[in-house]
């Protein structure tokens, strides 16, 4: 018998594939970011070096397929397609929440297939902060073993939990549990928001807790409050539908969250990353890598080749952006000047950030 968690996972996947679930009134903020064009790049575009070292693993480009799915039999071919594409292109990938496999071990294959299809890729496991108190360190280690993960992501999705009728609304003790896991787990720990962004205040707390990287998961991409609107509407839960509509665009947009989160830790820029130019802007703002999920849901349902096609297009766009900025490698791009204007400039100014320094060549942060 399929568990409630497993049923919810396939429901989420179908909704993301078939319904408009992105932010409606809030953007990720990339339109407020301008890369400085170099009319004389003095580079051979075909010889640019896009590779990075990320949490102990070599990636051929600073990009990861963000956590999408797992935990239902129908998600196994989806994860297989994503993993095979990541392996072919030399990028990383995260699995969806492994909670379903803890609730029902028969669902483990939907996650194990990722390592089977991507034996050398950077793969991270995934569990919710609301569940780590229940599972403890031993349970978390089982998640790592399940997929031979290179790292573990602990996702923060309290906005979604607050709206879900079945959500876990008790957020007490999570930071202490994160500290404990970071101190004893033999793998890097990534803290990952899921669409509402990470603030400066929380970044400092996470750095002190010993996390290895922060995935900002900013507003401007998939809205999980929006996903819950469709679930609530289908079940006739008008109270949850109202809450989802109200909080559809809640959170810190991705660009602002990248800058808020700069605390001497690797940053993954997630939330509304849709083009290679978005990737380039993220790196220039200080991210170590970028990631996206929604652009690959439809292609993954079609198969590996469709995923490779979309990924290759984004990486080609990224290569061109690097070339036009006169950047031979990722460190050059991190040092490249970038201008922040508009709403993002106003927001960050009020938050006390001097973004004018970003317009000067050289990574001074």
UniProtKB/Swiss-Prot annotation:
Record flagged with keyword Cytoplasm: yes
CDD domains with a match to the protein in the record: IDI-2_FMN
InterPro entries: Aldolase_TIM, FMN-dep_DH, IPdP_isomerase
Residue ranges the record marks as coiled coil: none
Keyword flag Ligase: no
EC number: 5.3.3.2
Domain of life: Archaea
Family named by the database record: Belongs to the IPP isomerase type 2 family.
Protein name from the UniProt record: Isopentenyl-diphosphate delta-isomerase
Organism expressing this protein natively: Methanosarcina barkeri (strain Fusaro / DSM 804)
Lineage, top ranks: Archaea, Methanobacteriati, Methanobacteriota, Stenosarchaea group, Methanomicrobia
Gene coding for it: fni
């Amino acid at each position: 018998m399929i568990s409630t968690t497993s049923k919810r996972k396939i429901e989420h996947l179908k909704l993301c594939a078939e319904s408009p679930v992105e932010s409606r009134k809030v953007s990720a903020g990339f339109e407020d970011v301008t890369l400085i064009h170099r009319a004389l790049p003095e580079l051979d575009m075909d010889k640019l070096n896009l590779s990075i070292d990320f949490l102990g693993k070599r990636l051929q480009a600073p990009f990861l397929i963000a956590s999408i799915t797992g935990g239902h039999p129908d998600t196994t071919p989806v994860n297989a397609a994503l993993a095979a594409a990541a392996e072919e292109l030399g990028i990383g990938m995260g699995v969806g929440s492994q909670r379903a496999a803890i609730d029902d071990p028969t669902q483990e294959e939907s996650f194990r297939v990722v390592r089977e299809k991507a034996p050398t890729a950077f793969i991270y496991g995934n569990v919710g902060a609301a569940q780590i108190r229940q599972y403890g360190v031993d349970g978390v280690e089982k998640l790592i073993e399940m997929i031979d993960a290179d790292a573990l992501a602990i996702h923060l999705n309290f906005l979604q939990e607050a709206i879900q009728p079945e959500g876990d609304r008790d957020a007490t003790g999570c930071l202490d549990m994160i500290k404990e896991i970071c101190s004893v787990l033999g793998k890097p720990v990534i803290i990952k928001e899921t669409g509402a962004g990470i603030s400066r205040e929380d970044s400092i707390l996470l750095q002190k807790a010993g996390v290895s990287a922060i995935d900002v998961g900013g507003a401007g991409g998939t809205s999980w409050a929006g996903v819950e609107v469709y679930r609530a509407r289908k079940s006739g839960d008008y109270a949850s539908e109202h809450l989802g509509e109200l909080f559809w665009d809640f959170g810190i947009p991705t660009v602002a969250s990248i800058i808020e989160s700069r605390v001497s830790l690797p940053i993954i820029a997630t939330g509304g990353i849709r083009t290679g130019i978005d990737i380039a802007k993220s790196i220039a703002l200080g991210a170590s890598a970028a990631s996206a999920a929604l652009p690959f849901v439809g292609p993954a349902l079609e198969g590996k080749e469709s995923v490779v096609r979309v990924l290759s297009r984004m990486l080609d766009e990224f290569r061109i952006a690097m070339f036009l900025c006169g950047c031979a490698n990722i460190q050059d791009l991190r040092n490249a000047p970038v201008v922040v204007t508009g709403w993002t400039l106003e927001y960050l100014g009020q938050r006390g950030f001097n973004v004018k320094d970003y317009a000067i060549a050289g990574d001074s942060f």
